[in-house]
Amino acid sequence: MFRSFLHYILRWLAKKILKKYKPDVIGITGSVGKTSGKEAIATVLESKFSVRKSSKNYNNEIGVPLTIIGVEKTAGKSVFGWIKIFGKALSLIFMRDKNYPEMLVLEMGADKPGDVQYLVEIAQCKVGVLTFISHAHTEFFKTIKKIAQEKRIIISHLLQDGCAVINFDNEMVMECAPTTKAEVMTYGFKEGAGLRATDVNFIKNDVGWPVGINFKVLYKGNVVPVYVQGVVSRSAIYASLAGLAVGLFFGVNLVEGSQALSKLRGLPGRMRLINGIKGTLIIDDTYNSSPEAAKSAIDTTAQIEINVGSKRFVVMGGMLELGSETENLHRELGFKIAELEIDYLITVGEAAKHIAHAAKEAGMDEHRIAIFPKAEVAGTFLQDKIKTGDLILVKGSQSMRMEIVVKEIMAEPL
């Protein structure tokens, strides 16, 4: 009862604030890449406008209104805390805050059917960004088709003077283009994308480890170089492209956007590079996991050059909320790992056992596969196993606590 009442009040307050201040709202959703996309979009827009973005992963029926109000921390179960938040919202409504942002970049999650519809009814988006549609939360949506239907609402609800920014490389995303009367801008790696990334390279330090990526962006005959520090993933490139596309719609040119992105840093737990003990390098991708994101992370790990004699480790925790597809989707990862130049596979948790079993079936040496029930044990095992020059990817769903593995083998606390 209290939660329903809270949702109602927050929704009412948020809509009143938006009606008064009329900021341009940029909404972003997708199975993967929401948070990194949000960060890139905000970084580009901040070069010309006052911008507020969703704090942390505030992407639901509580988090989105709190971002609109300008609160970075929920009150939890504190009635007094919520009264203070309501008071701040009412002061915004009945008084005028000269510093209210010109733009809001709102991450919109979809854990269950109806979530995106609820959020866009609170905040009508000027720009809708759809990053990717893949298997995630299938436990609640049952099929990927139903996931797609929910995610596409962020595009179909746009008004004619708005803009849909969509991933050209994802077929299910592109199917939403005909559902909107708004301008459509596409981005990706494939030929035909409006903003296209090419010539991707890892930037290396003096000892040969990657410290970031650079690439070129092609747009209407123009070519602009982009450099992003501290990450090595395709997801960072997709996020940068989305940021540039949104920037273009609001008048931030490619050069200005590229310069802004050079200030972007990798987010904790999202393909971030961390120095490990014994002169190793960790790819920390522990924030969360989904089948598509895991495949991309494994591909990236296999592509990074290491010295002769050094090893690549993949440490995988289980992926949650996959319903009846749990076993099959984990097994796909195991088959993929066995095909690539991955030297050791370490799994954590019950679901991840399917990864290990599939890798063994596909021909990976069983002596190079280790199965552990908890992250702490896997971390201790790794401490003894890794050597100078080794590369370690650590990934898993949030509840698997895979960040514990990273803490066990990182060179210095962050």
Regions found by a protein language model. Give the residues of each.
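Short hydrophobic/aromatic beta-strand immediately N-terminal to the Walker A/P-loop
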Residues: 25-27, 393
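A conserved segment at the C-terminal end of the G1
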Residues: 28, 36-54
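Short glycine/serine/threonine-rich phosphate/pyrophosphate-binding segments
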Residues: 34-40, 61-63, 111-116, 237, ...
